[in-house]
Amino acid sequence: MLVNSQDLSLSSYDYELDSKLIAQKPLNPRHDARLMVVSKDNGPNLCVSHLKVWNLLDELRAGDLLVINNTRVLKARLRVRLKSGAMAELLLLEPHGDGRWLCLAKPAKKFLPGDYVWMEALEQESLKLQVLTKDLETGGRIVQFPQEFSNRKSIENLLERYGEVPLPPYIRQHDPSDADRYQTRFASTPGSVAAPTAGLHLSDEILNALIQRGIEKASVTLHVGLGTFRPIEEEDLTNLKLHSEWVEVGEEVVSAVQACRSRGGRIFAVGTTTVRSLEASFLLGGGSMKAFQGLVDLVIKPGYQFGVVNGLLTNFHLPKSSLLLLVSALIGRERLLELYQEAIERKYRFFSYGDAMFITPEAVLPGAKSPRVLQ
C-alpha cells in the first residue's frame, strides 16, 4: 500500500478543537453517547450516519465477533512527600521486578537518584521509597518500594487502597465516581494506567443485547501505558517507535477468530489497543494468529495492512497521537480528518469520556487489507 510524504509527517495529523468539546464526564447510561457510523455508498464515497452507541446493535449481525480489552485501570497515582517537605506525585507505569517500578514523577526535577520520598496516607508510619535512577527512554524514574511490596499483587493492593485514578490532564475536575466510570464494565485484569476508552461506551445492557442477538465476544489484554498515551515528538514518522506495552492474546481468542472466519462473520475491535493486540498476534504468527503474552511495541500507521480486524469502534482521539495514526491506517488520513471536522461541526464530544466512531468493513481502504487473509 502506497503512502505519501504527508502521511509520514506528524504535523499532518493536527487539527483544532474547541476545548468546550472535550468531554469532562461520561454520559449515563454509557450507551447513550453519540456514534458516528462510517460506511460507504456503492461508489468510492463514504457514507456517514449520526446515531447513538445503542444503535451498534443494528450495525452488527449474528455470527460477528466483537473483541474487547479486559484490562483494568490501576489507581496508579500516588501522593508523596519530598525531603523538602513539599508534596509531589508518582504515576506508576510498569514493574521492573523486586519492588522496582518505572514511574512518571511530578515535578520530575525534584526526584533525584538516591533521594527518598515518603507516602503518608498509611495508618502506620510513612512508607519510604527510594529514587534509584532516571530512565533515559521515558524521562521517568525507577523507584524502589520496601521489601514487603516486592511482588506485583502487594503493590496493586497498596494502590487500590491509597492511590488515585490517573485521569487524563484534560479532564479538569476529578470526581469520586471516576473510580467506577473510568473502568469498562468488563475490566478484570489490573495493569493499566489509562482506560481503553472505546470500551467505556459498552454498558451491561448493550453487552447482553449483543449476546442475545448471536454476536460473539472475546477478550484480549493490553495494559495501557506510555505506548498508547505518550505524545509523539518526532516530525518524521518513518521510523516511529512506541514504548512497549504488555499484551496477552489467549488460545480462546485465536479459536474465536478462526471460528468467525469459518462461518463468514466479521471481526470488530473495540478500541485501538484491541487492534494492536490482534495484529501483533497475526504478525507473530507469520500471517496466522498465534496465542502469546509479552511486550508489544507495534506501530500501526498508514501503509499497514490489517490481517485480523475488519472494523473498529473507537473514540475521537487527540491531535498528533499514535491512535490517530492507527485509525488513519484503516480509512486514510485525509478522510479521517474530514470526518473529525464533521464531528466538530456537529458538536461531538471528544477524547476519553466523549462520543464514538464506528468504522464498518466497507469503509476500510482496500489497500489496508492484508492479502494473506481472506477479508
Swiss-Prot record:
<dbReference type="GO" id="GO:0051075">
    <property type="term" value="F:S-adenosylmethionine:tRNA ribosyltransferase-isomerase activity"/>
</dbReference>
<comment type="subunit">
    <text>Monomer.</text>
</comment>
<keyword id="KW-0963">Cytoplasm</keyword>
<keyword id="KW-0808">Transferase</keyword>
<protein>
    <recommendedName>
        <fullName>S-adenosylmethionine:tRNA ribosyltransferase-isomerase</fullName>
        <ecNumber>2.4.99.17</ecNumber>
    </recommendedName>
</protein>
<comment type="pathway">
    <text>tRNA modification; tRNA-queuosine biosynthesis.</text>
</comment>
<comment type="function">
    <text>Transfers and isomerizes the ribose moiety from AdoMet to the 7-aminomethyl group of 7-deazaguanine (preQ1-tRNA) to give epoxyqueuosine (oQ-tRNA).</text>
</comment>
<dbReference type="Pfam" id="PF02547">
    <property type="entry name" value="Queuosine_synth"/>
</dbReference>
<dbReference type="InterPro" id="IPR042118">
    <property type="entry name" value="QueA_dom1"/>
</dbReference>
<dbReference type="InterPro" id="IPR036100">
    <property type="entry name" value="QueA_sf"/>
</dbReference>
<dbReference type="GO" id="GO:0002099">
    <property type="term" value="P:tRNA wobble guanine modification"/>
</dbReference>
<dbReference type="InterPro" id="IPR042119">
    <property type="entry name" value="QueA_dom2"/>
</dbReference>
<keyword id="KW-0671">Queuosine biosynthesis</keyword>
<comment type="similarity">
    <text>Belongs to the QueA family.</text>
</comment>
<keyword id="KW-0949">S-adenosyl-L-methionine</keyword>
<dbReference type="InterPro" id="IPR003699">
    <property type="entry name" value="QueA"/>
</dbReference>
<dbReference type="GO" id="GO:0008616">
    <property type="term" value="P:queuosine biosynthetic process"/>
</dbReference>
<dbReference type="GO" id="GO:0005737">
    <property type="term" value="C:cytoplasm"/>
</dbReference>
